């Protein structure tokens, strides 16, 4: 993957436009989870230390495009940056006709979705963004799968378009896990539905040595082996697809499961062999034998790709499977990459953040990369590097 890297450029005195992912949750005007801002800070600091004139922007939430709405303003992010950095950070609301900046100064450009044409990758808007800068830095992996004016169009017209450190690290880690993995490669795919992860499963079945399935997805595979799944979430119309995937790749299917009669966090977990599941049972997690078997597979892996929990880990009585998988990944010396919103929540809950080699910041972008799709922002950066 050949792209220009920001770290290879001399940014002194240059106008630098960073497209970051600062789409953070905000409550009562305060940032409630700062993970994405923290991930972007090194890029911002590098530019400031290099003596660049720095502009950083992002989307936040889903405002009506082209209309200002205070609840979607980046002002809370500006307030956070003012506390986190040694310089004064201002918010620019009207910036499309140009800005005056000094070297070492940082300005946050208001939510890009307040600009009409942002989502449609409007050429005129893209050119206005490009006119603001000498160097465009794409550093938002989380939106790299969307061709929008601030993630794609601007890069087509900017004098120089490059990958920021966060994006470059993300591409490198995912490339290491997928393009040239040390084997065995074990892929873990959880989540509620096969249909939403079907392309991921198909893509990974071709490259993984073992494909571990969990959550509602696993129920469809249990049904594909001819077992009753009771009232569990599963997709009857995809049983044949599951059977086909099992012929193409080693997919260890659960032998025991944790069930209950109702979807309730206080419901008692009943451990059953898969052949004993009743018509009124609902499967919410892997059983201890299945968890132990998967932990052993993970222990022998050299590369691990993890997307999605393997049970309803939000409920104390049904967290054991995801906890067991998490701990096995944490203890494994393998190169591990994890991504997807629920996966990150599980990593936080079980405290294994420091033990995962790389945690992806992208939800949809992570999945599309794993599906083998070309990400528009990356395609643009490759084209501009030629």
From Swiss-Prot:
Major place of residence: cytoplasm
GO cellular component: cytosol
Gene Ontology biological-process annotations: gluconeogenesis; glycolytic process
Name of this protein: Phosphoglycerate kinase
UniProt-listed Pfam families: PGK
Species annotation: Vibrio vulnificus (strain YJ016)
Top-level taxon of the source organism: Bacteria
Pathway named in the protein's UniProt entry: Carbohydrate degradation; glycolysis; pyruvate from D-glyceraldehyde 3-phosphate: step 2/5
Keyword Transferase: yes
Subunit organization: Monomer.
Localization in the cell: Cytoplasm
Recorded catalytic activity of this chain's protein: (2R)-3-phosphoglycerate + ATP = (2R)-3-phospho-glyceroyl phosphate + ADP
Entry binding sites for substrate: 21-23, 36, 59-62, 113, 146
InterPro entries: Phosphoglycerate_kinase (IPR001576), Phosphoglycerate_kinase_CS (IPR015911), Phosphoglycerate_kinase_N (IPR015824), Phosphoglycerate_kinase_sf (IPR036043)
Swiss-Prot/TrEMBL keywords: ATP-binding, Cytoplasm, Glycolysis, Kinase, Nucleotide-binding, Transferase
Family note: Belongs to the phosphoglycerate kinase family.
GO molecular-function term, one example from the UniProt record: phosphoglycerate kinase activity
């Amino acid at each position: 993957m050949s792209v220009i890297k920001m770290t290879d450029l001399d940014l002194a005195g240059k106008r630098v436009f960073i497209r970051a992912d600062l789409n953070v949750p905000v409550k009562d005007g305060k940032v409630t989870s700062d993970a994405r801002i923290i991930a972007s800070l090194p890029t911002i600091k590098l530019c400031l230390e290099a003596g660049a004139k720095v502009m950083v922007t992002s989307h936040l939430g889903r405002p009506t495009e082209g209309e200002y709405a205070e609840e979607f303003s980046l002002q809370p992010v500006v307030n956070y940056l003012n506390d986190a950095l040694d310089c004064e950070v201002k918010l620019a609301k009207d910036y499309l006709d140009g800005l005056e900046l000094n070297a070492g100064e940082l300005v946050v450009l208001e939510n890009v979705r307040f600009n009409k044409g942002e989502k449609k990758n409007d050429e005129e808007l893209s050119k206005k963004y490009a006119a603001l800068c000498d160097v465009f830095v794409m550093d938002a992996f989380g939106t790299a799968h969307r061709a929008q004016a601030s993630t794609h169009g601007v890069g087509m017209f900017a004098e120089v378009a490059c990958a920021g450190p966060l994006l470059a690290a993300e591409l490198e880690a995912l490339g290491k896990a997928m393009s040239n993995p040390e084997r065995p490669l074990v892929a873990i795919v959880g989540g509620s539905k096969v249909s939403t992860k079907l392309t991921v499963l198909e893509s990974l079945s071709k490259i993984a040595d073992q494909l571990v399935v969990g959550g509602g997805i696993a129920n469809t595979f249990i049904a594909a082996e001819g077992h009753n799944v009771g009232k569990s979430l599963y997709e009857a119309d995809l049983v044949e697809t599951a059977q086909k995937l099992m012929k193409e790749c080693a997919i260890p299917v659960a032998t025991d499961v944790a069930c209950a009669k109702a979807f309730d966090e206080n419901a008692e977990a009943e451990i059953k062999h898969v052949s004993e599941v009743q018509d009124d049972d609902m499967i919410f997690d892997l059983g201890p034998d299945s968890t132990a078997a998967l932990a052993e597979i993970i222990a022998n892996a050299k590369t691990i790709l993890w997307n999605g929990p393997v049970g309803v880990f939000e409920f104390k009585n049904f967290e054991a499977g995801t906890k067991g998988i998490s701990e096995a990944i944490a203890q494994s010396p393998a190169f591990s990459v994890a991504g997807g919103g629920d996966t990150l929540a599980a990593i936080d809950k079980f405290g294994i953040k420091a033990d995962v080699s790389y945690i992806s910041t992208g939800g949809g972008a992570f999945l599309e990369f794993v599906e083998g799709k070309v990400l528009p922002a990356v395609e643009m950066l490759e084209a501009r590097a030629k």
